[in-house]
Design a protein with these regions (language model features):
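Active-site diphosphate/adenylate-binding microenvironment
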Residues: 16-94, 98
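Short coil/turn segments at secondary-structure boundaries
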Residues: 12-13, 59-60, 218-219
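Short, isolated positions within intrinsically disordered regulatory regions of eukaryotic proteins
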Residues: 8, 14-17, 25, 75, ...
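Thiamine diphosphate
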Residues: 1, 65-66, 70-276
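Helix N-terminus capping/helix-initiation residues
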Residues: 7, 38, 242-244
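Glycine-rich, acidic loop regions that bind phosphate or pyrophosphate groups
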Residues: 1-16, 208
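Short secondary-structure junctions and interdomain/linker hinges
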Residues: 4, 8, 21-36, 53, ...
Length: 276
């Protein structure tokens, strides 16, 4: 395959598509949303603050998908993101491991508040062992990725936000008094609270200059989505429901399935008498 190349027409299509997507990325990075920034703008600020040898780490929630779509990797070892099992809690521990593997690189860990709550204990390990990492703690007061997924199949975001129960017994009361910045400080990390993108950019500069693990805490608006990839995730929808939203989601799901192409099929595919 050494000398094999696609034809020029197809290569030009690829270049055009790549340029168009790059324009979408730039627009997502430039979003100036208030009062809370979009997650894509936070990612863009980190990309602008990193150099070619820095490493980013991520794992669960909406961050891996957004990083996969938006982040422009500049080094083969500069991008360490776990996708397959969406392992909540992997991020900080993985960042510690990456830094141990190559102490010469600055490591930026992207983690949402849901994953942070699952496992943050390696912060104290990083302090104990004098292994500095930078943790970008993106707070949206809940499990927003799975919340959005549940909405996409026609059901509400049940139990996916950090709320008190209301008088009706539902998890729709006031926000819980969660202060993950204080928690990170209690584990020995330097903590910088950023209230907007300008403060966030300054915090990234300070975090790089610090000599111990630093957590940069910023809230974002979970309703501002990154550009759509155009791909489709086969997540089945309940076939029987009293909810209008679920029935409508089922129609969309069944329509989307018609576009599936099966490249690998058993030899008895479509045989009604087959036991499989």
């Amino acid at each position: 395959l050494k000398d094999w190349r696609v034809d020029e027409e197809y290569a030009e299509q690829c270049r055009t598509a790549a340029a168009a997507w790059n324009d979408s990325v730039e627009a997502a990075y430039a979003l100036d949303h208030h009062p809370l920034p979009a997650q894509s703008a936070i990612i863009g600020a980190v990309e602008a603050a990193t150099n070619d040898r820095d490493v980013i780490v991520g794992a669960a929630g909406s961050l891996p998908g957004d990083l996969h779509k938006l982040w422009r990797t500049r080094d083969p070892k500069g991008y360490h993101v776990e996708y397959a099992f969406s392992c909540m809690g992997y991020e900080i521990a993985a960042g510690l491991g990456v830094k141990m593997a190559d102490p010469s690189r600055e490591v930026f860990v992207f983690v949402g508040d849901g994953s942070y709550l699952m496992m943050n204990s390696e912060i104290i390990t990083s302090i104990q062992e004098d292994i500095k990492i930078i943790v970008i703690l993106v707070v949206n007061h809940g499990f927003q990725s799975i919340g959005a997924l549940s909405e996409s199949v026609g059901v509400e975001r049940f139990g996916t936000t950090y709320r008190y129960r209301d008088q009706a017994g539902q998890l729709a009361g006031d926000k819980l008094p969660l202060d993950l910045a204080a928690n990170a400080a209690s584990l020995g990390a330097q903590v910088i609270r950023a209230n907007n993108l300008e403060e966030f950019r300054a915090a990234l500069v300070q975090a790089r200059a610090n000599t111990i693990t630093t957590v940069v805490h910023i809230e974002d608006d979970p309703t501002i989505a990154a550009p759509d990839s155009g791909s489709w995730w086969d997540v089945p929808v309940a076939e029987v429901s009293t909810r209008t939203s679920t029935r409508e989601a089922l129609v969309r799901y069944e329509e989307a399935r018609t576009a599936q192409r099966h490249f690998l099929r058993p030899t008895n595919w479509g045989d009604p008498d087959s036991p499989s």
